[in-house]
């Protein structure tokens, strides 16, 4: 197991490098970067001071149209601006350096977990990630916990009544829930229960109320649960299928084994066979899959659900950074997402070997 873990940990480095490198060069050839957006903001008069790296800015008063001819500029939005202004904007965002120099600087900074500062926010990228990460982790943990609390009893019941009408109908509903994307459930929940068209039972935005700090501790708990209900429901509704069917199939596999036949021949009751023998063995792989389920909820649920419910998590942070072309934040969130996913996959493999020593990854 030690050699396998070393190999997996060493594979994290080239995987991170490949993902960051591919996205870096894709972004370089994509139109509409931060310089283009800054130029557009100046031309349309949307900002008096445009924030740049280090919190400084470019004065719009220096960018009166009709000064100079910059038809040779690489930025299509800057045709009426002074070339010196465009050069200043380009310098502030670091795009005056060659692409290879920016690339290697980014790699060196990321090795040291130095993601720089946001282009459009007065904070470092690491600070923004630290503030946003707990929200995404909380959403993922709640979703995973509820999925386990529902899927395990449901899977056991489906195994006990295998082939019955309950099994058939529950399978149909599970498949339908699995096929419908989480964001569609989120829209339905908002329309029906968040003041859309019918009931106004739950808040639409945020994780806590505006007066959260002034509430007593018990009301803080209630307020938090009140806000998290709809986002968690939207995340978990489509997440029951895989774990429920895994639980059912694990039970059915155990029931067919020889030790169950022997226990029945000895006169052991079906209840004791189910809960004292089959349950313990069937739950090994189900429990070991907790990290993998959390990864699924963390990645698939964080982006769209956080955007739709305005939860200040890592998914919403990455989405807003992508829309505004805030490259340091965008690449920083991508780096953290990838690193967490790779490490949790390793934890998942370790948990499998802990609950079932027969699983051997050394032969891989």
Curated annotation (Swiss-Prot):
Residues on Periplasmic side: 1-8, 59-135, 194-224, 306-326
One of the GO BP terms on file: peptide transport
Chain segments annotated as transmembrane: 9-29, 38-58, 136-156, 173-193, 225-245, 285-305, 327-347
Subcellular localization(s) per the UniProt record: Cell inner membrane
Topology, Cytoplasmic side: 30-37, 157-172, 246-284, 348-364
GO molecular function, one term: transmembrane transporter activity
Residue ranges of every copy of the ABC transmembrane type-1 domain listed in the record: 133-348
Keyword rRNA-binding belongs to the record: no
A Gene Ontology cellular-component term: plasma membrane
InterPro entries xrefs: MetI-like (IPR000515), MetI-like_sf (IPR035906)
Family annotation (PROSITE patterns): ABC_TM1 (PS50928)
Membrane topology (UniProt): Multi-pass membrane protein
One Pfam family here: BPD_transp_1
UniProt keyword terms in alphabetical order: Cell inner membrane, Cell membrane, Membrane, Transmembrane, Transmembrane helix, Transport
Task performed by this protein: Probably part of a binding-protein-dependent transport system. Probably responsible for the translocation of the substrate across the membrane.
Protein's recorded name: Inner membrane ABC transporter permease protein YejB
Organism: Escherichia coli (strain K12)
Highest classification ranks of the organism: Bacteria, Pseudomonadati, Pseudomonadota, Gammaproteobacteria, Enterobacterales
Gene name in the database record: yejB
């Amino acid at each position: 197991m030690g050699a396998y873990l070393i190999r997996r940990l060493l594979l994290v480095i080239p995987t991170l490098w490949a993902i960051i490198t591919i996205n870096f060069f894709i972004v370089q050839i994509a139109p509409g970067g931060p310089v283009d957006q800054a130029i557009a903001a100046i031309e349309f008069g949307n900002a008096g001071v445009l924030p740049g790296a280090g919190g400084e800015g470019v004065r719009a008063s220096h960018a009166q149209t009709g000064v100079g001819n910059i038809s040779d500029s690489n930025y299509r939005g800057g045709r009426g601006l002074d070339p010196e202004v465009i050069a200043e904007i380009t310098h502030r965002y670091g795009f005056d350096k060659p692409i290879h120099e920016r690339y290697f600087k980014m790699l060196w900074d990321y090795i040291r977990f130095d993601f720089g500062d946001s282009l459009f926010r007065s904070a470092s990228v690491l600070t923004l990630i630290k503030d946003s990460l707990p929200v995404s982790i909380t959403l993922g943990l709640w979703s995973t916990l509820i999925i386990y609390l529902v899927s395990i009893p449901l899977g056991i019941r489906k195994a006990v009544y295998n082939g019955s009408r309950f099994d058939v109908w529950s399978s149909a509903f599970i498949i339908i829930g699995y096929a419908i994307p989480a964001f569609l459930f989120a829209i339905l929940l908002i329309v029906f229960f968040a003041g859309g068209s019918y009931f106004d039972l739950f808040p639409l935005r945020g994780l806590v109320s505006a007066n959260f700090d002034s509430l007593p501790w018990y009301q803080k708990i209630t307020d938090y649960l009140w806000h998290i209900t709809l986002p968690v429901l939207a995340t978990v509704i489509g997440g029951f299928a895989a774990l429920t069917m895994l639980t059912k199939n694990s039970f059915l596999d155990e029931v067919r084994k020889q030790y169950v036949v022997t226990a029945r021949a000895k006169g052991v009751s079906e209840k004791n066979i189910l809960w004292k023998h089959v349950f313990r063995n069937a739950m090994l792989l189900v429990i070991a899959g907790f990290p993998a389920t959390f990864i699924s909820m963390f990645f698939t649920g964080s982006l769209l659900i956080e955007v739709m419910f305005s939860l200040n998590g890592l998914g919403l942070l990455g989405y807003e950074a992508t829309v505004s072309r805030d490259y340091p934040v965008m690449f920083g969130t991508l780096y953290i997402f990838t690193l967490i996913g790779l490490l949790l996959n390793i934890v998942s493999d370790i948990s499998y070997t802990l609950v079932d020593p027969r699983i051997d990854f050394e032969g891989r």
